[in-house]
Amino acid sequence: MENIEQRVKKIVAEQLGVNESEIKTESSFVDDLGADSLDTVELVMALEEEFECEIPDEEAEKITTVQQAIDYVTAHLKK
C-alpha cells in the first residue's frame, strides 16, 4: 500500500493536471502548482474521499501546501 505522502501527491497530480515528479512537499498549490480557488476546493474533496475523513472549511483554508495536506491527513487518520 502506498504511504500517505505518495497518495496525497497522486491526488494533487490528478486534480491539478501536473506531473507527479514536479510535486514537492513544500509546493504551494496556488503559487507553485497553478491551482485556483475551485481547484483547491476540488482537491480537498478528493482528499476527503481518498482518506475517508472530513476536512472542515476553516481547516481546508489552512492547507496551502502539499506538506500541510500530508500533515492534516496523518493527524486525522489516527483518531
From Swiss-Prot:
GO molecular function, one term: acyl carrier activity
Family under the similarity heading: Belongs to the acyl carrier protein (ACP) family.
Protein's GO biological process: lipid A biosynthetic process
Residues that bear O-(pantetheine 4'-phosphoryl)serine: 37
PTM per Swiss-Prot/TrEMBL: 4'-phosphopantetheine is transferred from CoA to a specific serine of apo-ACP by AcpS. This modification is essential for activity because fatty acids are bound in thioester linkage to the sulfhydryl of the prosthetic group.
Pathway membership, UniProt: Lipid metabolism; fatty acid biosynthesis
Function: Carrier of the growing fatty acid chain in fatty acid biosynthesis.
Highest taxon, organism lineage: Bacteria
Higher taxonomy: Bacteria, Pseudomonadati, Pseudomonadota, Betaproteobacteria, Rhodocyclales
Gene3D superfamilies found in the cross-reference section: ACP-like
Subcellular location: Cytoplasm
Carrier domain location: 2-77
Protein name in the entry: Acyl carrier protein
Keywords attached to this entry: Cytoplasm, Fatty acid biosynthesis, Fatty acid metabolism, Lipid biosynthesis, Lipid metabolism, Phosphopantetheine, Phosphoprotein
HAMAP family: Acyl_carrier (MF_01217)
GO-annotated cellular components: cytosol; membrane
InterPro entries in the cross-refs: ACP, ACP-like_sf, PP-bd_ACP, Ppantetheine_attach_site
